[in-house]
Structures are given as structure tokens and as C-alpha cells.
Amino acid sequence: GSIIMRNLEKYKGVIPAFYACYDKEGNVSPEGVQALTRYFVEKGVKGVYVNGSSGECIYQSVEDRKIILENVMKAAEGKLTVIAHVACNNTKDSQELAKHAESLGVDAIAAIPPIYFHLPEYAIAKYWNDISAAAPHTDFVIYNIPQLAGVALTQNLFAEMRKNPNVIGVKNSSMPVQDIQMFKQAAGPDYIIFNGPDEQFM
């Protein structure tokens, strides 16, 4: 196999999910976002996972998600590894967020599979690769959360995605612990498997 040289150290450590921050009117709060980011910096965590499930991304507009990420990056001042979840329920918006995230200098982008309709695996791979192509210089993390997305990352789909050199690993929030072992074994040391559920912290 080819030897992949990449620095995965920046992904090793505690990377909490970033919570949605709103003002009293229910709008995204840039001040709140910056305050929470600074809190994480002070606590000494390795990084943050922005605009994921805890960030309520599926209820937010593209514009809101950009504002959140911009304010995280501003307050983090390079002290945190930032993984930005960019998936929307259409490729175009996802690509726009991916491109935006890369322009801000995030460490990685992440995406869940398309939700609602259960698409065949080749369509999921195309969706992910199209998003990744919009941020060609940025690491890509697959987000496996079958209980919410309705589709699971299979070994075949993972193998297909590893052909994309930007794919560095999986954020796994499926419940069976065996899944993590399985992905680890399949991918080897050049990939990182992030563990989603707190109760499986390793």
C-alpha cells in the first residue's frame, strides 16, 4: 500500500461538540459563540467539533452556520483543532459550507450521510466526495450516526471513501463498540476513529 504521511496528532485528545448559542430573540449569538470558544481554550481541550448534532445544525441556515464558524475561528486564535461539520440536506449548500470552512483555515470538515431518503452507497460516496472536493486542501471526516441518519457506514462504503486522500477517519456515534474496532482494523494506523458517544469514552 502507499505510505500516507499525515499529522493526526492534532486530532488526539478531547474534542467536545460545540453547543448552539442563541440570544434572547433566538438568533445565533456571535458573542455567545466566542465566549464558549474561549471557555474551551481555557479548559485546555484539544479542539472543538462545530455545527454537529449538538450544534443543532440541521435547523440552521447556511448563513447561521457560517457566522458560528467564523466566530469560533476568531476566538480560538489557532489554539484549538477545529472540525467543522458542513453537511446540509443538499450537496450545493454543503459544498458552500465546505469551501467557507476551508477559507477560514479549519483543520477538518465532517459530514453525515444524506438524511431522510435511504440512498444507495455509491450515491452517499458521491455526496461525500463532492463535498470534500469543495475543500480540496482540508482533511475530511466521515460522521457515522446511523440511529439518526438512517444509514450506517458499512465496511464497503468506508473502503470506497478511503480512496479519497483527504479522508482521515470516522467520527463514530453508532452504539456497538465493535464498530469502532472494525473501522480501526480496516483502516489501520493512518486513520483516526473518533468516538462519538460519551459513554464509550476510550
Which residues does each predicted region cover?
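Active-site beta->alpha loop and helix N-cap motifs at the rims of alpha/beta catalytic domains
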Residues: 6-16, 21-152
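Catalytic alpha/beta core domains of metabolic enzymes, predominantly
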Residues: 134, 146-202
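Short, Lys/Arg-enriched N-terminal segments with co-localized hydrophobic residues
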Residues: 1-4
